Amino acid sequence: MHDIKWIRENPEAFDAALARRSVEPAAAGLIALDEKRRSVIQSLQDMQSRRNAASKEIGAAMAQKNMELAEKLKAEVADIKENMPRAEEEDRQVSAELNDALSRLPNMPFDDVPDGKDEHDNVVARVTGQKPGWNHAAKEHFEIGEALGYMDFERAAKLSGSRFTVLTSQLARLERALGQFMIDLHTSEHGYTEVSSPLMVRDEAMFGTGQLPKFAEDLFRTTDGRWLIPTAEVTLTNLVSGEILEQEKLPLRFTALTPSFRSEAGSAGRDTRGMLRQHQFWKCELVSITDAESAVAEHERMTACAEEVLKRLGLHFRTLTLCTGDMGFSARKTYDLEVWLPGQNTYREISSCSVCGDFQARRMNARYRGKDDKATKFVHTLNGSGTAVGRCLIAVLENYLNDDGSVTIPDVLLPYMGGLTRIEKAA
């Protein structure tokens, strides 16, 4: 959510910032709505002041036995009371219209974010590791998994339809090992606090992190009105909604390993085979709550934490700075990590780390106060994948494939695999 006061004071800068995200000029319309709202509020305050004054005047008139004046004042008060509900309703309607307009506009990008239309305009910040050097033919993960006998799409479709997967035996264990490795790394070495939180949330939580109102079609909703989380960013960030935090206790760093649920409404025909784009998938999420001064440095730190997962797995990847046309709705700046997949002969996103400024905090009313301050400020929020477990599984299968069709377990995962060093075809 944007600060209407800042927009009033900087209309040209606001429009210029959103123009970088291909948004039409909006400042004039927002300011007009705000002026209307302020006018209605002023009228209400005038009515309330006059009602209070007239009520006192009635008492004075009665004391002076000026019944004619008293009756006239009573009629005036009655008229004000009759008109106030209409004015209050107008205030609610205009405020709702302004808030709805503000809530549908994306965040303003930082100045150092590259301008661009889509993913083709993203900028490579760095490349880490080397592509595998083996000589045998590369295969896609679903070919490997099905040949091993531990990846079953037909039974998944029987149970749930398309974009689901059943993993069994050694691949199920590998998936679990990856998630446990990630959560252990982030809690024991990176300073994040593990959180176990609900997988279903109310409208307010989805609004707070920016999924609502614009992106409802990308979500799953239960019949009683709750939403399945598309990412644990929703629950972890909303932990501080409506709260005033102590600045000296910031940053707060949360992590959770949860299933995520997405309808993939805009992905028809894309990645229909395999595990790349699923309705349900495991992800290790990272969220930081900071003060304004620390947010940019925290973004670099969070991205490094996500990169460390891939480094320890020995995977080749690149880090991109997303352009204005490819960033998420709530982000001011985003780094994407793209892992190398030999079977596809390309890089694919495996993590996205974003700094959101106070955009989400305004929607959630999450604030902090300095030790010697009376006034509060909005917190700054950050979120990132540390990382997507399913896509990490894909990367391990394709990068650690042996010429006999088996898959070597990365060294860092061996403590989680019960003595298993490679995954071989089911007997």
Swiss-Prot record:
This is Serine--tRNA ligase. It catalyses: tRNA(Ser) + L-serine + ATP = L-seryl-tRNA(Ser) + AMP + diphosphate + H(+); tRNA(Sec) + L-serine + ATP = L-seryl-tRNA(Sec) + AMP + diphosphate + H(+). One of its GO terms (biological process) is seryl-tRNA aminoacylation. Its EC number is 6.1.1.11. It comes from Agrobacterium fabrum (strain C58 / ATCC 33970) (Agrobacterium tumefaciens (strain C58)). Catalyzes the attachment of serine to tRNA(Ser). Is also able to aminoacylate tRNA(Sec) with serine, to form the misacylated tRNA L-seryl-tRNA(Sec), which will be further converted into selenocysteinyl-tRNA(Sec). Keywords: Aminoacyl-tRNA synthetase, ATP-binding, Cytoplasm, Ligase, Nucleotide-binding, Protein biosynthesis. Pathway: Aminoacyl-tRNA biosynthesis; selenocysteinyl-tRNA(Sec) biosynthesis; L-seryl-tRNA(Sec) from L-serine and tRNA(Sec): step 1/1. It is an enzyme of class 6 (ligase). Gene3D superfamilies: Bira Bifunctional Protein, Domain 2, Serine-tRNA synthetase, tRNA binding domain. L-serine binds at T231, A232, E233, E285, S385. Homodimer. The tRNA molecule binds across the dimer. Belongs to the class-II aminoacyl-tRNA synthetase family. Type-1 seryl-tRNA synthetase subfamily. Its main location: cytoplasm. GO terms for cellular component: cytoplasm. It is found in: Cytoplasm. Consists of two distinct domains, a catalytic core and a N-terminal extension that is involved in tRNA binding. GO terms for molecular function: ATP binding; serine-tRNA ligase activity. PANTHER family: SERINE--TRNA LIGASE, SERYL-TRNA SYNTHETASE. ATP binds at R262, S263, E264, E349, I350, S351, S352.
